[in-house]
């Protein structure tokens, strides 16, 4: 269990907030605009998840080809072949959950692209929709969050990867339980995920 999860389990939201603020004092605002790299996402999840770009889904025949240990961090390419919008996919006893920090439905980020841009980035088909429909047809419930955890109005906010990493680190929680945990800290969600990911990455660096 990650250190911050242990703090929350033992002391609740207020204890977690105090611990995170002590560990990450003074640098959160700047880093809310600093996106995580795929290496950061892999490190935060200790390699126990798949990390894919959207074009990787083209070859997938089912969600079994997408998920690793029931999790996948999925990068929609919206800017270049290495940059875009992070989302998460979880398989739990309750079914498959798609997590977008903006609260968008699966494949909504594809609508941000012109047809020409989509083809250039090899995102001309709705492959995730295809795979989720297949899972649903096989009897596996599929859901997605409709709540925006990430600030929508701030164009400088680049916390989607941080949101996805935190949600995937809490794949044992239901989405309402996860939302309740965030709310219990008294922080807005962008501040929370920035402090958590900064603290975890710094802790890993110290141990290296």
Task: Give each language-model segment a name.
Residues 1-96:
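Cysteine protease catalytic domains with a Cys-His-Asp triad
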Residues 38, 42, 64, 129, ...:
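Generic detector of well-ordered alpha-helical segments enriched in charged/polar residues
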Residues 74-169:
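Cysteine protease-like catalytic core of ubiquitin/ubiquitin-like
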Residues 144-208:
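Active-site or metal-binding loop neighborhoods of secreted/extracellular toxin and effector enzymes
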């Amino acid at each position: 269990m990650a250190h911050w999860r242990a703090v929350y389990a033992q002391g609740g939201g207020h204890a977690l907030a105090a611990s995170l603020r002590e560990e990450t004092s003074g640098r959160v605002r700047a880093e809310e605009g600093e996106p995580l790299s795929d290496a950061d996402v892999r490190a935060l999840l200790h390699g126990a998840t798949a990390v894919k770009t959207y074009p990787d889904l083209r070859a997938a025949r089912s969600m079994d080809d997408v998920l690793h240990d029931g999790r996948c961090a999925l990068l929609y390419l919206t800017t270049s072949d290495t940059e875009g919008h992070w989302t998460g996919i979880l398989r739990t006893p309750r079914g498959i959950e798609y997590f977008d920090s903006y609260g968008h439905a699966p494949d909504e980020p594809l609508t941000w692209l012109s047809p020409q841009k989509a083809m250039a980035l090899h995102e001309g088909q709705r492959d995730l929709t295809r795979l989720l429909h297949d899972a649903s047809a096989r009897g596996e419930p599929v859901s997605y969050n409709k709540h925006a955890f990430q600030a929508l109005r701030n164009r400088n906010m680049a916390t989607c990867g941080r949101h996805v990493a935190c949600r995937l680190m809490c794949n044992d929680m239901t989405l309402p339980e996860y939302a309740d945990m965030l709310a219990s800290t008294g922080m807005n969600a962008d501040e929370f995920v920035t402090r958590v990911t900064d603290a975890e990455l710094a802790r890993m660096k110290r141990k290296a």
